Every structure is written in structure tokens, then in C-alpha cells.
């Protein structure tokens, strides 16, 4: 059995307004090589961008990997590590019997995460963590670039 590649992934989401124009930023490191990704949407929320960033990163990987995924989003980390299990048991309903917000992205993140061994880590945002700061720059630049792409999942919830 071959050993899985160890990939370090850093993600961040940004939104100007919430809702408003938004973007995500990703920095991926593997054996000294760095790949950056970002994209923006015309109308979305900060939480949707915080979820979309790890989804895009994980979906970009072509094989199962061992991943250390670092984000400044407690919402994303708590959701994928803790809340999602109850949501799935309850048919994607919260403990208050209301539909889970951003369910389209939670389902995508859950599916993308299944292929990998992931250590979900949290870092305080805007605290000088180099990769997190870079993700923030990428996400903010994508949100500020007058994006025209539509976040169809957000539009459906409006």
C-alpha cells in the first residue's frame, strides 16, 4: 500500500456586505510547491465562501491524500467535525427542526472530504499567520474584482 501524499491546505472566505460580493482564497502546499486559487461571486455570504474554499481545494485533488486543512472559520470547522453528523441523521435539519443553511455546500464538503484523511485545524484570523493572511488577500481581491459569477445556491435560499 502506498503512503498518502501530505498536503497542507489553507482557506479563507470574504464577503463585502454579507450578503454582498464575496470570494474565497486557497493556498495549497505540497513538498515545497505552492498553488493558489481564488474566485469571486456577485452576491453571496461570508459563510458560503468559508465553505466553498475547502470544497474547491479538496475537489482539485486527483487522488486520496492526507491533509492538514487550516481555516479561520469556526463555522466550517465545527460544522464538518461535529454538527454535520446530527444534521445527516435528522435529514439535514437542525436541532430546532429548521433546514440547515447552506445545505448544498455542506453536502459537497461532506462528499469531498470522504476521499481524504483530514486534520481540520483552526487558526485565529488576522493574527499574522502567513498562509491565512495570503488566503485573506486572495479572497478579498476576488470579492473586490466586481465578480459577475452567480452563487446559485445562495440565490435559491433568498
Curated annotation (Swiss-Prot):
Its main location: cytoplasm. Transmembrane segments: none annotated. Mg(2+) 2 binds at residues 12, 136. One of its GO terms (biological process) is DNA replication, removal of RNA primer. It is an enzyme of class 3 (hydrolase). One of its GO terms (molecular function) is RNA-DNA hybrid ribonuclease activity. Binds 1 Mg(2+) ion per subunit. May bind a second metal ion at a regulatory site, or after substrate binding. Pfam families: RNase_H (PF00075). It is found in: Cytoplasm. Mg(2+) 1 binds at residues 12, 50, 72. InterPro entries: RNase_H, RNaseH-like_sf, RNaseH_domain, RNaseH_sf, RNaseHI. Its EC number is 3.1.26.4. The keyword Cytoplasm applies. It catalyses: Endonucleolytic cleavage to 5'-phosphomonoester. Residues 3-144 form the RNase H type-1 domain. Keywords: Cytoplasm, Endonuclease, Hydrolase, Magnesium, Metal-binding, Nuclease. It comes from the Bacteria. GO terms for cellular component: cytoplasm. Its cofactor is Mg(2+). Belongs to the RNase H family. Endonuclease that specifically degrades the RNA of RNA-DNA hybrids. Monomer. This is Ribonuclease HI. The gene is rnhA.
